[in-house]
């Protein structure tokens, strides 16, 4: 959990926002997936948001659903994902690592065991996409018991009560959703969300990172101008993977360019 705090402190000293890429672990194969993560970090990613392949990812649009299918086709299991996470953490001791999960995967071996495993491999945060704040008690208590930050989604239509709950229960960062619906770069992020950011700050919520539909540097700048601490981009990155499945080296070089440009936009 402290890694997020250290990151945000470091960035605010430099007057920079955070750029956080999302990819699905094991897409398109475990070996290439680790190379992709190396590339994202080398290009300037401030933290990682990683998905564990799941058969029915409700919050995700077609791009990330396809990433899940590719990882499944490569035979990737949750156990293998934890091995990959341990490898990433060993290589990068300081970068914050967040997981984006669905409740079934957390439940499968027991909630407490899941968070314990996360702690063992060096995961910093877990967002359970299909568990609303009101039903989150068993997840967030197990998370905190093992030193893992529970992350909550703040939707664009959040009312005051929900904002207070998110501020009270969330740690690490707050996932500010740019618009209703599923993930995807096809639909642009809806801005501005200044009023939400102002309220989250007033209630001392964890720093907001904005995601869903963030696919170009201009949007990163708009996100930071609205007061968010940074931007998360997933579908735009996964599309680069999808487009270059037969050219793994081109894939890595295009990813490097994209992340470098997105990161550059966080520097005022």
Curated annotation (Swiss-Prot):
MF term (GO), any: tryptophan synthase activity
Keyword Lyase: yes
Keywords: Amino-acid biosynthesis, Aromatic amino acid biosynthesis, Lyase, Tryptophan biosynthesis
Keyword Lyase: yes
Enzyme Commission designation: 4.2.1.20
Gene3D superfamilies referenced in this protein's UniProt entry, alphabetically: Aldolase class I
Catalysis: reaction(s): (1S,2R)-1-C-(indol-3-yl)glycerol 3-phosphate + L-serine = D-glyceraldehyde 3-phosphate + L-tryptophan + H2O
GO terms for cellular component: cytosol
Entry-linked SUPFAM superfamilies: Ribulose-phoshate binding barrel
Listed pathway(s): Amino-acid biosynthesis; L-tryptophan biosynthesis; L-tryptophan from chorismate: step 5/5
Active site (UniProt): 49 (proton acceptor), 60 (proton acceptor)
Quaternary structure and partners: Tetramer of two alpha and two beta chains.
NCBIfam families recorded: trpA (TIGR00262)
Function: The alpha subunit is responsible for the aldol cleavage of indoleglycerol phosphate to indole and glyceraldehyde 3-phosphate.
Family assignment from sequence similarity: Belongs to the TrpA family.
Protein name: Tryptophan synthase alpha chain
Organism: Pectobacterium carotovorum subsp. carotovorum (strain PC1)
UniProt lineage: Bacteria, Pseudomonadati, Pseudomonadota, Gammaproteobacteria, Enterobacterales
């Amino acid at each position: 959990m402290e890694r997020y705090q250290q990151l945000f402190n470091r960035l605010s000293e430099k007057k920079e926002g955070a750029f956080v890429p999302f990819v699905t672990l094991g897409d398109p194969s475990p070996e290439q997936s680790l190379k992709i993560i190396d590339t994202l970090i080398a290009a300037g990613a401030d933290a990682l948001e990683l998905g564990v392949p799941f058969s029915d990812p409700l919050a995700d649009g077609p791009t990330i659903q396809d990433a899940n299918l590719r990882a499944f086709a490569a035979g990737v299991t949750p156990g293998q994902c934890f091995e990959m996470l341990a490898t990433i953490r060993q290589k990068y001791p300081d970068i914050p690592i967040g997981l984006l999960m669905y409740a079934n995967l957390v439940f499968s071996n027991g909630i407490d065991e899941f968070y314990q495993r996360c702690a063992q491999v060096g995961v910093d945060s877990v967002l359970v996409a299909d568990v609303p704040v009101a039903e989150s008690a068993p997840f967030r208590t197990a998370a905190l018991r093992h030193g893992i930050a529970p992350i909550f989604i703040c939707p664009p239509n959040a009312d005051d009560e929900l904002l207070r709950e998110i501020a009270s229960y969330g740690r690490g960062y707050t996932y500010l959703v740019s618009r209703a619906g599923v993930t995807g770069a096809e639909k642009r992020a809806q801005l501005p969300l200044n009023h939400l950011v102002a309220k989250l700050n007033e209630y001392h919520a964890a720093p907001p990172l904005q995601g869903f539909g963030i696919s170009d540097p201009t949007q990163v700048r708009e996100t930071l101008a609205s007061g968010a601490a940074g931007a998360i981009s997933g579908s735009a990155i996964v599309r680069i993977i999808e487009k270059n499945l037969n050219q793994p080296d081109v894939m890595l070089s295009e990813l490097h360019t994209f992340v470098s440009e997105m990161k550059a936009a966080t520097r005022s």
